[in-house]
Amino acid sequence: MEVDQIPLADVVFVIEGSAINGAYINELKTNYILPTLEHFTTGSIDEREYLIAERFATLYGIVVYRTAANLLEPVCSTYGPFLQPQKVMETIERLPLVGGGMESCAHMAEGFAAAHGCFDDISERRQLLDQTSVQRHCILICNSPPYQMPTTESWKYPGKSCEQLAALFNERKINLSIIAPRKMPVLFKLFMKADGDQPITSKNYAKNIRHLVLLKGYSLKERAPSPNSMAAQMAAPNAAQATVQQQQQQQQNQAGQQQQGQGMPMDTTPAQQQQQQQQQQQQQQQQGNPQQQVMNMNTMQQQQPGPNPPAGLLNPQQQQQLLQQQQQNQFVSNQMQNQNFQQNVGPGQNRWMYPNQPGQARPPFMQGAGNVGGVGQGGGMQQNPNSALISRINAPPPNQTVTSLQQQQQQQAQQQQQQQQQAQQQQQQRMQMLSQQQMLNHQQLQQQQQLAQQQQQQQQGQQQQQVNPNAGNNMMPASNAGNMSNPQQQQQQVGQQSNPQQQGNPQQQQQGNSQQEQASLREKIWTGVLEWSEKPKSDQQKIPHTLQCTVCTNIKDGEPEIKAENWPPKLLMQLMPKHLVGNIGGQFLKDSKMVVFRPTPGEALDSLAKMMTSGYAGCVHFSSIPNSPACDLKVLILLYTPDRNAFLGFIPNNQAMFVERLRKVIQQKQHGNMQQQQQQQQMMQQQGKSPMELQQQQQQQQQQQQMQQDNSQQQHYNQFQLNMQMGGGGPGGGPGPGPGGMPMQQNQMQMNMMQQQRMPLGVGVGVGVGPGGVPNPNLQQQLQQVAPNVAAMQQQQAQQQQQRMVRPMMSNNNPGLRQLLQHQTTPGNQFRPQMGGQNPNQMGAGGPMVGNRNFDDGNYEFM
C-alpha cells in the first residue's frame, strides 16, 4: 500500500486520570486502544517505518483530565502531537492514572475543551501543508460521569457545559467515540449529542459484556452477542426435566400438608391436588396487582357458559387461570424485548410455565376426572363439573395466545429472512456491476500504460544507442522481460476479478476505487534502469544487479512536483546501513520531497527487497551525461517499507548540505573502522607475546615518559635563567661590573640551588633525594640559609621593575629582552609549576591543546 493511499486523520485521546480508570487501562489498551492505532496506521505499529514526512502521517494527541481531589495540579494536561503510534502507546503506559480522592465524578468538560484546543492547533498545522480533507476523531476513555458545572480553566471555550461541548463536536464534524469499562446513561446521552441526536446502532464491539464501546467514523472487530443462559439448559435437557419433576413432587407434598392443616377434606382427588399445587407455585412466582385479578375474575365469570358453580370451588380455579394468563403476557413481553431469547428457545418450548407443557399437566386432569367418575355417583357428581370446568378454562386461552404469537413471530422471521435475501441479492448485483466497471477501467489503464511505456522505452533505447551502443544492447533484455511480464499480470488480475466469490466485502471495493482515484493524482516522470552491486559475505567479487523501474510524483497545481527532464537514463545506487542515514539528521529527510519507485517484478526486485529489509538503505547518485544539460540533483535516498511493499525516494531540498554531511558521516565511519582494526591487531599482538616481553614494553614506555618530563624541566629551567639575567643586570644588560653585578650572581647561584631542589621533588627523581627516597640533610641546611636572601632578592627585583616602568626607553637598549618579549605571550602559563606526574605537553602557552581531538558534531538532531 502506498503512502498517499492512507487516509489522513487527526486523533485525540481524552483519558480520565484517576485510579478508578487506571484499574482497567491495561484491558482497554489491549482490546480497544491498540486496535484503534492499528486501524489508523493500516498495519501493525511495530513493523511500520517512520522515515516519512508530516504531510503523509496521522497526528495523535493525548489529553488527561482529573478530579476535584487534585487541587495542586492543573485540571488538564496535554501531550503531543505525535507522528509515531509507538510513542502514543509509550505515553499512555507512563500516564499516572492514580488518585482521584474517591470522587464519583470528573472534569470531563475541561477535557473536552482541551481536546477542542488541540484540534485547533492541529488544523493550523494542516493548513500550512494545504491539507483540508482530514478526518478528525476524539476518543473518550473514562470510568466516571462528568461534574454538572461549566468549564472554568479554558480561555477559548469558557462557561460551556459537557453537553454543549459534545454538541460542538457534531458542529465541527469531529467524530466522538466513547470507550468505558462500565455502561453509564450519561455516556449514551453525550454520544447522541455528539452524533446529532441520531439513534445508537446495534453493533457490538465490546470484548466484555460490561464494557461500553460506542464508535463513530471508524469500526473495530465486531463481537458476537452475549451468550444466553438458555443455551446451558438446551445443552442438558435431561437434567432440567429431572430437576423440574423433583420440584413438582416436593410442591405436591407441601400442598398436601397445607391442606391438612387448613381443615380441607382428605378425600381430594389427584386432579384437585395438582390444581392447588399449580396455584401455589404461580402465586410464589408472580407479584401482580390484586385489583386487576379481581376485575379479570369478574370478566371470566361473565364469559363462562352454563350454570354458575359454587363460589368456594370457582374462586381458586379462576384465580389460577388468571395468574396463568398474566404469566403468559409477561412471557410474551419478555420475548419481544429480548431477541436472543427467541433464537435460543424453540416454538414448542416454554421456559417459565412448566405445568402447562403438553404431556405433563393436562393429561392427569383428564385422567383424574375419568377415573373418579367411575368410582361412585356422589363423587362423580361433585368432581365431573369441576374437571370439565378446569379443562374449559385452562386449555383454550393459553393455546390460542401462544400459538398465535408463535405464528406472528414465525411470519416476522420469514419476512426478515426474505428482506435479508433481497438485500444480499442487490449487493451481489452491485458488486458484479462494480467489478465489471473496474475490470474495464483497469484494462484501459493498463493498455494506456503499456503504450506509454513502449514509446518511452523506444525513445530511451534510441538515445542510449547513440550515446553508448553497448549499454543499449544490455538494456533490451530487461525491457523485453518487463513487457512480457505485463500481460501475465493482466491475466492474473482479470482472472481474480472475474470470480465474484473471490472478491472481498464492499469496503475492499471502495478502497480499491479510492486507490485508483489517488493513483490517478500521480504522474510518471521517469523510466529507466537502476543499477547497484551486492557484496556477498565472503571475499568474492561484487554481484551487479539492474532493475527496470519507473518513478512517479505527486501533482501540485496541475504540474508534477518534481521534474525529471535532465535525469540520466541509468541511476547508480550504493547500499549503505540504515543507521548511517539516521546519523545524517532527521531535518534533511523532513525538509525533502518524495517520489515513488515502481520496479518491474523479478529476481532483482526480490534481492533488493531482501537487502533493504535486513537494515540497508539506498543512496542513489545522479551522474551527468556528456552533451546534455546538467542535473540539479546529486543524491536521492531510497527506503523500502515492507508493510506497504513500496519503495520511497526522498530528495533533500538542500543537496549541498546533505552531501557534505553524508561525506562526514562516511569518513567518521571509516575512521572508526580503522581504529577498531588497529585495536584488534594490538590485542592480537599482545596475546601472542610472553609476560616478560609485556613487562619490558611497559618499562620502556615509562622511561620514555620520564625522559620527556626531564627535557621539559630543563627547558623551564633555562627559561628561568634568562629571566633572571634580564632582571638582575645593570644598565649594560648583564651581570657585569655594574653596581648590582656581584649580589645578583650570588642570588643567581642561590636560585639555582633552590630550583635543583624543587624540581626533583616534583618529578620524584633528582639530586635532593637519595637512592632509597631519603632526602639529603646538607641540601636542607643550605636551603634554610638561602631562604632570607631569596626574600631580599625578590624585593630588589620589584624595585628595579618599578624603575624600568619609570624609564621605559631603557628596555630598548637590551636586545635579549626585546626578543623575549616578542616570543613571550602569557608569562603566567610559562612559570606555572609542574605538578607531579603531569605531562608537560598537555598545557602550553595557549591553554589545553585541542589540535589532536577527533571531529565531534553534536549540533545535529540524530534520529
Swiss-Prot record:
Residues 224-408, 456-520, 669-743 are annotated as: Disordered. A motif (LXXLL motif) lies at residues 817-821. Keywords: Activator, Nucleus, Transcription, Transcription regulation. It is found in: Nucleus. InterPro entries: Med25_PTOV, Med25_PTOV_sf, Mediator_Med25_VWA. GO terms for cellular component: mediator complex; nucleoplasm; transcription regulator complex. GO terms for biological process: positive regulation of antibacterial peptide biosynthetic process; positive regulation of transcription by RNA polymerase II; regulation of transcription by RNA polymerase II. One of its GO terms (molecular function) is transcription coregulator activity. Residues 370-381 have a biased composition (Gly residues). The keyword Nucleotidyltransferase does not apply. Residues 467-484 have a biased composition (Polar residues). Residues 225-264, 272-344, 456-466, 485-516, 669-687, 695-725 have a biased composition (Low complexity). The keyword Oxidoreductase does not apply. Component of the Mediator complex, a coactivator involved in the regulated transcription of nearly all RNA polymerase II-dependent genes. Mediator functions as a bridge to convey information from gene-specific regulatory proteins to the basal RNA polymerase II transcription machinery. Mediator is recruited to promoters by direct interactions with regulatory proteins and serves as a scaffold for the assembly of a functional preinitiation complex with RNA polymerase II and the general transcription factors. Required for activated transcription of the MtnA, MtnB and MtnD genes. Component of the Mediator complex. Belongs to the Mediator complex subunit 25 family. This is Mediator of RNA polymerase II transcription subunit 25. It comes from Drosophila melanogaster (Fruit fly). The lineage of its organism: Eukaryota, Metazoa, Ecdysozoa, Arthropoda, Hexapoda.
